[in-house]
Design a protein with these regions (language model features):
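Short, loop-centered acidic/histidine patches that primarily coordinate divalent metals
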Residues: 104, 326-329, 377-380
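Low-complexity, Pro/Thr/Ser/Gly/Ala-rich linker/spacer regions in secreted
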Residues: 33-48, 426-439
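Sec-dependent N-terminal signal peptides of Gram-positive bacterial secreted proteins and lipoproteins
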Residues: 4-24
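Extracellular glycoside hydrolase catalytic/binding regions
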Residues: 71, 79, 192-372, 390-394, ...
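Aromatic-rich peripheral "rim/lid" segments of glycoside hydrolase catalytic domains that contact
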Residues: 174-175, 179-186, 335-344, 348-439
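Active-site mouth of glycoside hydrolases
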Residues: 39-273
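A short acidic, often aromatic-flanked loop/helix-cap motif at beta-alpha or helix-coil junctions
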Residues: 66, 299-301, 382-384
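Sec-dependent signal peptide cleavage junction
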Residues: 19-35
Length: 439
């Protein structure tokens, strides 16, 4: 009798365990099926760079694609062989597979012919050397109209109210003019002088970008708008509507990756309620081949940077889209007072730096959360006063108009970090492509 009871109990436990395993398998399969933009059929995160790893790359700046409307031409000379030499140098590494190429809408308005020609040069040269390109619709301090000294982004014709948007009145999140303008942008009330709304105008501009480069094998995808400003807690869902509008429009022309960006400011104690749930509201309705980009300029070991990284990871899970660290580096910030007398945090160039240990730690943290890709800031012909923002030095030859591009120690630090974290010596079997045949 006792033996029968024991047998019966064992049978019940076995049946319960079997049901649990079956149900868990069904649940996991359904979860993976509903998240095919992040997970493959085996439930693993998509990673499409080298050997199934995340995309590893750099940010790159151009010339005509970054000229502001309200300032003179860039003082640093632009070498005629900039793209040829840059992509060739990048292709000779074992780890760099893409660039995040930033451009500005107002630069297109300033000189559309030169702008488009430069984009075509980028795409053709990237094709030649087997480097992928993400085309990033960038903005910094809103526009050179609002921030004449440093801003670049939206074209001047979208600031046609001289009372609300006085030229030079400030484009940072602390600026009253910027707050008003961005609020109206999310309400879709920003219009040109002929009455066309800003969203439609930007849609037309982005379609020109896609039409120019989408046919190229090197084109990886497009970033809708880098780091838009949020000023009130009701704007999160409005940004979601904006991203949905842009994604739906661009999907008529391309099936390639589309990226939407984090907001600024990222103040975890702000009244705009920066939390994972609100960040997830920015995602578009159509999440097929969609990626969420954020920036991180610090070591996410503890404190604010660690909390920030956790925030974006949580937002990614809620939204059901993978993460792209579109900008990463390490900087020191100090409190300063802006033109309106408000406290802001600015990069202190002399105190900013990144060591090999720092870079390895940052990349290791990114690997730990299972990202789609990352890009170091930055590769540029313009000399930056922040030393670790310079991946290359350029020796310009006035006689020929060309330049000799020499990677700096920071390029070596970045590539070694990628290599140390993602490539073990015994596992480094690289694919055969155009990069492996270069001299």
């Amino acid at each position: 009798m006792k033996t029968r009871s024991i047998s019966f109990i064992v049978l019940c436990i076995t049946l319960i365990a079997s049901c649990f395993i079956i149900n868990k398998g069904i649940f996991d399969a359904a979860y993976a099926q509903n998240n095919t933009n992040i997970f493959g059929t085996d439930g693993n995160k998509q990673s499409s760079g080298h050997e199934g790893l995340p995309y590893l790359g750099v940010n790159m700046r151009g010339y005509y694609t970054s000229l502001p409307q309200a300032r003179e031409d860039l003082k640093d000379p632009f070498p005629s062989n900039y793209y040829e030499s840059s992509f060739k140098t990048l292709s000779k590494t074992d780890v760099i597979d893409h660039v995040r190429y930033r451009f500005y809408w107002e630069s297109y308005v300033r000189d559309p012919v030169a702008f488009i020609k430069e984009l075509e040069d980028v795409a053709k040269t990237a094709d030649k050397y087997g480097i992928k390109v993400i085309y990033d619709n960038h903005q910094f301090h809103t526009s050179s109209w609002l921030n004449v000294g440093r801003g670049t982004g939206f074209p001047a014709y979208l600031f046609n109210d001289p009372v609300l948007y006085k030229q030079g009145s400030g484009g940072t999140p602390k600026s009253t003019a910027a707050e008003t303008w961005w609020t109206n942008w999310w309400n879709r009330t920003i219009k040109s002088v002929n009455g066309t709304d800003g969203w439609t105008l930007q849609e037309d501009f982005l379609k020109k970008i896609v039409s120019t480069v989408d046919k190229h094998q090197s084109t990886l995808g497009y970033e809708i708008l880098s780091e838009p400003q949020v000023h009130t807690k009701d704007q999160w869902t409005k940004i979601g509507k904006y991203n949905t509008f842009m994604v739906d429009a661009l999907r008529k022309l391309t099936s390639k990756t589309i990226i939407y960006s984090m907001n600024i400011p990222i103040d975890l104690k702000s009244p705009i309620q920066v939390n994972a749930e609100n960040l997830a509201k920015m995602s578009p309705n159509n999440k097929q081949n969609i990626v969420f980009k954020f920036s991180l300029y610090g070591i996410p070991n503890d404190g604010y940077q660690s909390d920030k990284l956790q925030l974006f990871e949580n937002a990614s899970r809620i939204a059901g889209v993978p993460l792209y660290i579109g900008e990463w580096n390490n900087v020191k910030r100090v409190a300063t007072i802006n033109e309106e007398g408000k406290k802001i945090w600015q990069i202190e160039a002399n105190q900013s730096n990144i060591s090999q240990a720092d870079a390895n730690m940052i990349v290791e943290k990114f690997k730990g959360i299972g990202i789609w890709g990352m890009a170091y800031w930055e590769w540029s012909f313009v000399i930056n006063e922040t030393p670790n923002f310079n991946l290359v030095d350029i020796m310009y030859d006035k006689a020929t108009g060309a330049g000799k591009i020499q990677p700096t120690k920071y390029f070596e630090i970045m590539t070694k970090a990628y290599q140390d974290v993602y490539y073990q010596p015994s596992e480094r079997v690289f694919p055969t492509d155009s990069r492996s045949t270069l001299s």
